[in-house]
């Protein structure tokens, strides 16, 4: 049996490994809670991220969404590819741009935003990472739609 070492470039995603929790804000002023668990999978060849986000509907009701992402590196091109599985049964594919402590990718446009394009930015910080969702409504430039500071609570 032959084993292949994981691509060294995956190390750039290492800041996403661990347990993270944060409270975020939406552009319209509402808040939400997010939990993320990131871990290496399949002998370190892939990163999995299990996520849940809870949005308060009223004083007694929360709208909770779950998703899981698997991130790997395409052998031929060296590009970072993510497959995201949602609790709505969707499978989304994203190509990631990975720079020093920063990950950017095109994301789904929030349905109530009436935007044309959305992108997500994950930025490494001393406490974990920040996640920003930006939208472009009319081609005039991106604006922040949501922001959450995710603090590492466990390795």
Give the ranges of each region predicted by the language model.
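Hydrophobic small-molecule pocket/channel-lining residues, especially in calycin-type beta-barrels
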Residues: 1-155
């Amino acid at each position: 049996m032959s084993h292949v070492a994981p691509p060294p470039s995956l190390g750039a995603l290492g800041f996403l490994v661990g347990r993270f929790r944060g409270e975020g804000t939406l552009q319209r002023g509402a808040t939400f809670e997010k939990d993320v668990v990131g871990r290496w999978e399949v002998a370190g060849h892939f990163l999995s991220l299990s996520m849940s986000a809870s949005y308060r509907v009223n004083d007694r009701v929360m709208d909770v969404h779950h998703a899981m992402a698997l991130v790997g590196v395409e052998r031929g091109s060296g590009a970072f590819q993510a497959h995201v599985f949602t609790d709505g049964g969707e499978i989304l594919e994203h190509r990631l741009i990975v720079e020093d402590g920063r990950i950017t990718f095109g994301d789904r446009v929030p349905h109530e935003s009436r935007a044309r394009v959305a992108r997500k930015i994950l930025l490494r910080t001393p406490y974990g990472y920040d996640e920003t969702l930006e939208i472009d409504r009319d081609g005039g430039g991106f604006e922040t739609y949501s922001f959450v500071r995710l603090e590492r609570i466990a390795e």
